Curated annotation (Swiss-Prot):
Organism: Erwinia tasmaniensis (strain DSM 17950 / CFBP 7177 / CIP 109463 / NCPPB 4357 / Et1/99)
Main subcellular location: cytoplasm
Subunit structure as annotated in this protein's UniProt entry: Homodimer. Interacts with FtsZ.
Annotated keywords: Cell cycle, Cell division, Coiled coil, Cytoplasm, Septation
Family statement: Belongs to the ZapA family. Type 1 subfamily.
InterPro entries: Cell_div_ZapA-like, Cell_div_ZapA-like_sf, Cell_div_ZapA_eubact, Cell_div_ZapA_N
The protein's name: Cell division protein ZapA
Superkingdom: Bacteria
Gene symbol of the encoding locus: zapA
Coiled-coil intervals: 22-99
Function: Activator of cell division through the inhibition of FtsZ GTPase activity, therefore promoting FtsZ assembly into bundles of protofilaments necessary for the formation of the division Z ring. It is recruited early at mid-cell but it is not essential for cell division.
Biological process per Gene Ontology, one example term: septin ring assembly
UniProt keyword Flavoprotein present: no
Amino acid sequence: MSAQPVDLQIFGRSLRVNCPPEQQDALNLAAEDLNQRLQDLKVRTRVTNTEQLVFIAALNICHELAQEKSKTRDYASNMEQRIRMLQQTIEQALLEQGRITERTGTNFE
């Protein structure tokens, strides 16, 4: 489906962006989050220059994204290691089962 114009209010300013209809709710939530971040920064930093606040917010968001990417990479690496260990355990168990079957002459069917 094609993108449609959506009007947003962020930090007292109107902004029109194109967005697919199925993503409009997520866009509105993102705009609300950004607006809240800018308001919080304004209070916390006492910076009044909107451009500076936007840059600070962008840097904070980029930092958060980098942290989340790092966590995701660490988690994926951990899961890959666990999967390899499980595969080795299963392979070892199957080899042992094969040796036991050969010794006893038992067929499992």
